[in-house]
Each structure stands twice: as C-alpha cells, then as structure tokens.
Amino acid sequence: MARSPGSAILAGARSPGSAILAGALATEPGPAYSGRAELKWVAPELRVLDDSPADLLVLHAFSDERPLSGLAGLVDWRLAGALSSWRIGGFSTGAFGERVLYPTGRRLSHPRLLFVGLGRRAEYRSDRALGVAADVIEAARGLGIRTLTTGLFHLEALASPLERVGPKLVHMLRSGSGLERVTIAADEEATRLVKDGIQFFGR
C-alpha cells in the first residue's frame, strides 16, 4: 500500500490492514472548553472556505463513492487530485471509520485535512454518522484542534429526516471538548432543515 507523502492513517482507524502511525501525530490535548463552541454556517464552496479559515478541515466519503462529490470533490480538485489518487493507489479506501490526516500546506485556509471513511452507502445510517462524528471529535481533541470545518457527514443523503438527526450532530460537535468554533459547510436547504430542527427541538 503506497503512502501519500506527508499523510498518515490515524491510530485507532478501523480499516483492516491500514498502516498505523502511533504517537507521531498526537499532541497534548488542550484544556477542556467549558462552554459550547461557536457555530458558523457556510456554503460548501472553495471561495467560501478560503474566507473561513480553521485549524482542521474534515471531509468524508463513502467507500463506493466514485468520483468524490460535494465538498470532498471540490477540495480534491484544489489539491490536484490527491484524494482521488489515494483511492486509486489503495492508500485510502473510504472504509467505515478510516481516518487519514493530511497537511495541506498553503493550498487551503485549513492547514490540516482529516479525510474520514463512511463505508458503503447502502450500509450507512444515522447512528453510524453520529459515531463517525464522535470519532472525529476525539481525534480533534488529541490533535489540540480549536476550530474545525466539516459537512453534515452525509446525513442529507439518508432517509431519516434531517431536521431530526441534524440537530443531534450539531449538538455533539458544539459540545466537543476543546473546540471553540465549529463551521458547518452545507447547502441552503440542508442548513434550513437543521436550523428548523434546532429551533423546534431546542438543541
């Protein structure tokens, strides 16, 4: 399995046979943030991301998602096909729970990218989405991340009403230990549904 230069499989990833880099990526976790993280909504566009810097950009994709779509596809284009090349070379498969950390240099306003596998689309459910989000929060804490940008972990692709499960995801992200700001990149309709759910269910 060829390893992409500068990238690594985070320890604890569930992808069988993945190379594990233990210790090298971890930093001392910062002190727990006592309040809820600030929440910001942005459009899933590169120019908007450029104007909304954060410590970490979280991208996610299904193992059978070809080609990469949405924000992951846009970022892949900005990175000259780096994410696609991982898949072609077998470095990253998108298996459920897989996490790849990648330094972006100056190509994005986010110095580090965390690419997360969601497994097969047909097997994906809202409880899996929330589980992946919890893993991301834990990884961010271990890396000392204060601000992050993420999508909705493909909740908008599920049959479950987004206005019901979306607020649970937002609450989980905002409650993450050490996080001071969470930026969610989502289209207008998904943003409206989640916001309506937050208002109705009080999350």
Task: Set out the residue ranges of the language-model regions.
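Intrinsic disorder/low-complexity signal
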Residues: L10-A11, T27
